């Protein structure tokens, strides 16, 4: 136990807060805390309960600040950012925040975190459900027998893009018996060398020099896109149903929907996947991954300034899980 938790444990107010959580008397609240005080209370609760935290903040700036404060007190604190939804085809659209989010979701699904801090707008955005993420996640080890072609199919299904040579995240390249993969969350790509169908060696390597930097025994390959069409035919039919429901003068919209349905059948994917996200997943967003304490900082501001605005944009999800702590 840290010295900060030790001091807080001597406080009657904190003891009452901790007792309320333990006995299930929720929601509970703590008022009058400074920004640093919020981090200290959350850290002390984590140490007492030994359960991970999901903390919602009003905006990105407050999320970044709280993440930094918590990281000085405990390890494996993750920041879950909001991302810009792409509803039209945009050349060269950045996927930086999407990849950051996928890394956080993968670590939450694996239980490899102590706290996740998220602006409420980010937490309310639809995303891949845990079951789908785990189904698309694969771990390979040195000595495994797996045909390279089979692994390539799994990578494509998980949203990776094939290149002649890997030069960025979410890419892979296959040359003979060598398979290079750059999963989200890693700082360097990984090279798998095969002897037939057996993984003979596995090493991280530098993108610029192509030199090996670290020998690995295993690699966890996680999805590289939040929207994956597991059943392209089913989604195509749902898009066609939307088109059939359009009436009046919505000719162009109907044509666009039918074109997307046709392209999805032919290629298995679409360049503007986000607009069909509600057809692909039944999701409560980040809340589906929460199995510990849910805390809200500045709860009144979160509700007024963010949730209403997100609802107006049609991006918010309905969550029945009760807030357990308001600070």
Where are these regions (language model features)?
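ASCE RecA-like P-loop NTPase motor cores
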Residues: 1-327
């Amino acid at each position: 136990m840290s010295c900060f938790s030790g001091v807080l444990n001597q406080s009657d107010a904190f003891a009452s807060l901790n007792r309320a959580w333990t006995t299930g008397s929720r929601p509970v609240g703590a008022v009058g805390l400074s920004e640093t005080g919020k981090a200290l209370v959350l850290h002390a609760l984590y140490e007492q309960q030994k359960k991970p935290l999901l903390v919602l903040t009003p905006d990105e700036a407050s999320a970044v600040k709280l993440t930094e404060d918590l990281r000085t007190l405990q390890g494996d604190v993750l920041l879950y950012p909001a991302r810009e939804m792409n509803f039209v085809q945009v050349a060269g659209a950045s996927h930086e925040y999407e990849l950051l989010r996928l890394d956080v979701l993968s670590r939450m699904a694996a239980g490899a975190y102590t706290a996740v801090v998220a602006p409420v707008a980010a937490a309310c955005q639809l995303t891949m459900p845990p079951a789908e993420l785990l189904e698309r996640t694969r771990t390979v080890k040195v000595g495994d027998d797996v045909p390279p072609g089979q692994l390539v199919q799994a990578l494509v299904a998980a949203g990776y893009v094939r290149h002649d040579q890997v030069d960025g995240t979410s890419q892979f390249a296959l040359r003979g018996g060598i398979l290079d993969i750059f999963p989200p969350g890693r700082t360097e790509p990984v090279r798998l060398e095969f002897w037939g169908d057996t993984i003979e060696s596995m090493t991280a390597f530098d993108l610029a020099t192509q030199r090996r930097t670290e020998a690995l025994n295993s690699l966890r390959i996680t999805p590289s896109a939040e929207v994956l069409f597991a059943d392209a035919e089913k989604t195509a039919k749902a898009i066609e149903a939307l088109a059939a429901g359009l009436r009046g003068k919505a000719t162009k919209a109907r044509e666009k929907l039918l074109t997307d349905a046709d392209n999805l059948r032919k290629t298995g994917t679409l360049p503007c996947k986000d607009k069909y996200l509600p057809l692909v997943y039944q999701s409560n967003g980040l809340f589906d991954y929460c199995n510990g304490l849910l805390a809200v900082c500045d709860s009144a501001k979160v509700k007024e300034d963010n949730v209403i605005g997100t609802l107006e944009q049609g991006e918010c999800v309905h969550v029945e899980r009760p807030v357990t702590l308001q600070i």
